[in-house]
Amino acid sequence: MAGYRKLGRPTDQRKAMLRNLVTSFLKHGKIETTETRAKETRSIAEKMITLAKRGDLHARRQVLSFVTEETVVQRLFEEIAPKYAERNGGYTRIYKVGPRRGDGAEVVILELV
């Protein structure tokens, strides 16, 4: 079994989509997407928050290599990471919204706790 979900896309498209989802999630604090995308986004976002909690230059550069906007990285290190300083993981929550009207895909809201 693979260690990640393929999401029905070639590798480059999948990575680009996940980078955009993680960036939007950290920028807005919550996103609405399908369940499998949310689960994949959650795992990456939690790793980014854990990196940001370290707070050193190397961690910032590692996050910058994945997150597409510098303002989001700044928000992650100055606002989000200090908020979770005492928490060991579990920074996100997934709420089920229901099926999407167009194709019946299960839609969820992914948000920061």
Swiss-Prot record:
SUPFAM superfamilies: Prokaryotic ribosomal protein L17 (SSF64263). The keyword Isomerase does not apply. GO terms for molecular function: structural constituent of ribosome. Gene3D superfamilies: Ribosomal protein L17 (3.90.1030.10). GO terms for cellular component: cytosolic large ribosomal subunit. GO terms for biological process: translation. Keywords: Ribonucleoprotein, Ribosomal protein. Transmembrane segments: none annotated. The keyword Ribosomal protein applies. PANTHER family: LARGE RIBOSOMAL SUBUNIT PROTEIN BL17M, RIBOSOMAL PROTEIN L17. Part of the 50S ribosomal subunit. Contacts protein L32. Belongs to the bacterial ribosomal protein bL17 family. This is Large ribosomal subunit protein bL17. The lineage of its organism: Bacteria, Bacillati, Bacillota, Clostridia, Eubacteriales. The gene is rplQ.
